[in-house]
Amino acid sequence: MPQDLTPGQLLARGACRCLVEHGFACVTELVPKPGLRVDVMALGRKGEIWVVECKSGRADFTSDHKWRGYLDYADRFFWAVDADFPAEILPADTGLIRADRFGGEIARMAPELRLAPARRKAVTQGFARTAALRLQGRTDPGLPLAPGPAGVTFSP
């Protein structure tokens, strides 16, 4: 395991392991539109889309003013936090994953928001393109990919 992962990246790793156990495929640091970058987007077997924001502490959470914008790209929205995080400060109408670098568990299921069909199609295509281009970039590091901090940006 790389030693230079941030606390948030370690939480994302654990959250992804948890979601894979629930039948999801995950992409980290995905940019659904300029100015937004979700920590984890997960695609389920039935096409459901979950977004997970990883928070390493109270200050990390209270300084995040963009998270409500992620609701437009998810059927369910979760926070991933460690065992010491004060869960009572998280909005009650969101999901909760308790995670560490080894895995996680869903402590509170998020309510279902249900994306509109056109948005679902665009988000799913953006997810697929991001995953495919990242995989291609790993096998061909010299390949120029689309711009964006995470490899690609899509705007459904």
Question: Where are each of the predicted segments found?
Answer:
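Short coil/turn segments at beta-strand junctions that form active-site/ligand-binding loops
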Residues: H22-F24, E48, D75
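Flexible, charged surface loops at secondary-structure boundaries
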Residues: L19-V20, G44-R45, L71-Y73
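Short, flexible loop segments at the rims of nucleotide/cofactor-binding pockets, characterized by
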Residues: E29-V31, E53-D60
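Active-site beta-strand-loop-beta-strand hairpin of nuclease catalytic cores
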Residues: P34, V38-V51
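Catalytic cores of nucleic-acid endonucleases
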Residues: R13, S56-D100
